[in-house]
Amino acid sequence: MHTFCILIPTFLVLVWTTESARREKQQSNDISFVKRKVQDGLKFSRVIKYTNETIQGMKTNFNSNKTQELSLDVLVVADFLSYQAFLEMSNGDSHRAIHNLKEYLHALFEQTKIIYDGISFGNETLHMVFAGTWIATQERDCPLWISWAEEEEERVLNEEIRRLEEKERDLNSTFVDDTFFMNSTDSDNSSTDALISSDMPKKLRKFVDITLEEMQENNSTEMTLKIDSKKAIDKFTIWLKEQTGLPRHEHAVLITKFDLISINGNSATQGMAYVGNICENGDSSSVVEDIGAGLTSLIMAHEIGHSLGALHDGAYETAECDSNDNYLMAVAVSGSADRQSFLNSRRMSNCSINSIIENLKEPTANCVKKWKTKKGKDVSQKDFIKKPGELVKITRQCQVAFGPTFIPCLHIGYFHEQSICERIWCSDGESDECQTLNYFPAFDGTECGYNMWCLEGSCVQNTKKWMDCKDINSKTCSKYSTSKLKHYCKSKDFREICCRTCAKKGKIY
């Protein structure tokens, strides 16, 4: 009984003391942290108090060692058809096929990264980070896998469409509403804007995308399998949301050998993405038809641009930017002998840049903004990163575009080492006929001469070679004058002996 009477007032005193302390803490706006430690079964507590000045100092110290940058982690996914194509190129060796395909996907990413490294968004650059790859080695694992029920449903739908078309021809009439709908989803038409206006829900902002003029009809799998482009992006989005074991990423790109078909049935569409849905789970994605190497990476960069918030140049909201200027976000990208037009294909117009800057201000795009610890420039690490053309040689670039038997065209009328940087010509090895695509530049880093490689469509000196080779006899190599080296370094045998010396002087040969 006595214990009960004693405990009550003690309890009340404790409550009053805690409440009083809370009020005092609120008034002073000080923050206290309790550090607890257990040693030999005994618990110790240490209260550490911080004032506003202390906290501000901590923030200052934190920020002084940190910097915010734009960074995007990109996952590259290959479908089953892509795997089959590389299996054929690897003579049925599955291990080699997977290895080669991984290198190809990495090369596509590196080329896309190079493109974005050259674009400034205000005072910032968007740094692409390679999140990894995922390859569908079985048909059932493919993100675009179509079940028997879906195939039957599509067959019935196609039959119905053909029936309606025949009826339409018989009646010699036009369905205005259907025509408008077809136009408003097909990237060949300016009225695409109807589905991407700012007052539309994001889920409806789907973009049937980039088209390429005068495309070759055949490539490594002859594009015999087709899929509706809208269905492709929808299936890929659902697939991404269902997967639990994928590498962590903020945008996913599906590389497919399916021929992407627009709603009106043509195959000019080469990619599709949601507009402005960067960072959104599953919706931050794009589907890219694998036309071939440098061209595929350009489409990939284009689609990521849409996801970041860019519209097509020349659209209603971007009317001041002419699509004919051939910038990255043009409706149709084409190859051109004009140097500036070629360079524009790797740049963004002011309209695209401004659209992306505005979209990145949205809270939904916060995943792109990251705090990084300040570090000194590590030039050596950057120098040792392989360029896409080092990962995938020119022969493989031909094979991906046209088939496993194709090699670079050596016909004197087509082949000039330096010209491959802007356009590669290929032949199947059994005929003199050479083929190319309307836009088919070599990957950056593709060899285009002795100690030369392709950068931005130009064949330039490969300074990286200086680090990769050494003179066998440096004393002998250093005794020759520049005029003599100019002559001697043309010899392959001499170059092998004086590799580093000839590499340094390579620009004069």
UniProtKB/Swiss-Prot annotation:
Give the site residues for Cleavage. Answer: 206-207
Domain Disintegrin residue range list: 390-464
Positions that bind Zn(2+): 302, 306, 312
Result after altering residue 350 to Q: Slight impairment in DTC posterior migration. Impaired gonadal localization and DTC posterior migration. Normal localization and slight impairment in DTC posterior migration. Elongated pharynx
Q: Where does the UniProt annotation place the signal sequence?
A: 1-20
Q: How is it modified after translation?
A: N-glycosylated by the COG complex; required for gonadal localization. N-glycosylation of the propeptide is required for gonadal localization but not for distal tip cell migration. Required for the regulation of pharynx length. N-glycosylation is not required for mig-17 secretion.
Tell me yes or no: is Repeat among this UniProt entry's keywords. yes
Give the UniProt tissue specificity note: Secreted from muscle cells and functions in the basement membrane of the gonad to guide DTC migration. Localizes to the pharyngeal basement membrane.
Question: Can you list the GO cellular component terms from the UniProt entry?
Answer: basement membrane; extracellular space
Which keywords appear in this protein's UniProt record, sorted alphabetically? Answer: Basement membrane, Cleavage on pair of basic residues, Developmental protein, Disulfide bond, Extracellular matrix, Glycoprotein, Hydrolase, Metal-binding, Metalloprotease, Protease, Repeat, Secreted, Signal, Zinc, Zymogen
Outcome when changing residue 183 to Q: Impaired gonadal localization and DTC posterior migration. Elongated pharynx
Matches recorded under CDD domains: ZnMc_ADAM_like
**Glycosylation sites noted in the Swiss-Prot or TrEMBL record:** 52, 65, 123, 172, 183, 189, 218-219, 350
Cofactor, free-text remark = Binds 1 zinc ion per subunit.
Q: Provide the protein's localization.
A: Secreted, Extracellular space, Extracellular matrix, Basement membrane
| Entry-linked Gene3D superfamilies | 3.40.1620.60, Collagenase (Catalytic Domain)
Q: What is its EC number?
A: 3.4.24.-
Claim: Magnesium is one of the keywords in the record: no
Q: Where is the PLAC domain?
A: 465-506
Query: What does this protein need as cofactor?
Result: Zn(2+)
Q: What is the effect of changing residue 52 to Q?
A: Impaired gonadal localization and slight impairment in DTC posterior migration. Impaired gonadal localization and DTC posterior migration. Elongated pharynx
**What does the function comment of this entry state?**
Metalloprotease. Acts in the basement membrane to control directional migration of distal tip cells (DTCs) along the body wall basement membranes, a key step that promotes gonad morphogenesis. Regulates DTC migration probably by recruiting fibulin fbl-1, type IV collagen let-2 and nidogen nid-1 to the gonad basement membrane thereby promoting the remodeling of the basement membrane. During larval development and probably upstream of basement membrane proteins fbl-1, let-2 and nid-1, regulates pharynx length, probably by regulating pharyngeal cell length.
Q: What is this protein called?
A: Metalloprotease mig-17
What's the encoding gene here? mig-17
